[in-house]
């Protein structure tokens, strides 16, 4: 589905979201950027380590809908960036006053690499 489209019928309400407790205990890394300090998100990436040592990486903000990439093992920073680049077609990036597609793509690829590197370090 594209932005602004959901599965709710007219008059239906979302009353609850259930998140398994084990998901809330995972190690995470988060990156967000906008063109102004309090501006609309230009790019956003969230990574979580899976119990089996993999990485779930979700990209949002700069694309028409969230994109989730599941790595069975922790990727290198370069592998994470390459996987994001391969998973998101050029026409999927937003092109508006909050950021050009090339900028959104570039910072998102940097975020993917940073997240893989951060989560690859030992926990404090």
Residue ranges of each PLM-predicted region?
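C-terminal structural segment of proteins
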Residues: 1-124
